[in-house]
Amino acid sequence: MTTKKQPDSTIALNRKAGFDYFIEDQYEAGLVLEGWEVKSLRAGKINLSDSHVIIKYGEAFLLGAQIQPLPTASTHFIPDPIRTRKLLMNKKELNHLIGSVERQGYTIVPLSLYWKKNKIKIKIALAKGKKEHDKRDTIKDREWQRDRSRIMKKNT
């Protein structure tokens, strides 16, 4: 008996977050979305690169994520591609995030958006910003890994 392969459930990745921040803890959260946004996410029309999470009034909100509406979206209202979206999380997780952001100088960045049991989830991370020299070190390490793999490939 063969099992069905699950298709890749990842909708979008924020590759810029790994370059700009030191990632500490990761959390999973649900998103409050409208119907047209879900349709656009199925089509993959989202950009997470300039987005971040803020905590206001004890709730988490996603800011700056651009979900482009499909051309077939309803004409009865004007969809806002950069609207603020509420994140659904446990109170315990929210309290931990609030403490880290306010006291220790962390920021919260989205890492990826994916499907989980027909629901859209977002992976967010508690992160500290990198300085310019840290980013240069990251670039040097990445280039060294590439060169090392080329050298190993030639020698084999």
UniProtKB/Swiss-Prot annotation:
Required for rescue of stalled ribosomes mediated by trans-translation. Binds to transfer-messenger RNA (tmRNA), required for stable association of tmRNA with ribosomes. tmRNA and SmpB together mimic tRNA shape, replacing the anticodon stem-loop with SmpB. tmRNA is encoded by the ssrA gene; the 2 termini fold to resemble tRNA(Ala) and it encodes a 'tag peptide', a short internal open reading frame. During trans-translation Ala-aminoacylated tmRNA acts like a tRNA, entering the A-site of stalled ribosomes, displacing the stalled mRNA. This is SsrA-binding protein. It holds the Pfam family SmpB. PANTHER family: SSRA-BINDING PROTEIN, TMRNA-BINDING COMPONENT OF TRANS-TRANSLATION TAGGING COMPLEX. It is found in: Cytoplasm. Residues 135-150 have a biased composition (Basic and acidic residues). InterPro entries: SmpB, SsrA-bd_prot, SsrA-bd_prot_CS. GO terms for cellular component: cytosol. The lineage of its organism: Bacteria, Pseudomonadati, Pseudomonadota, Gammaproteobacteria, Legionellales.
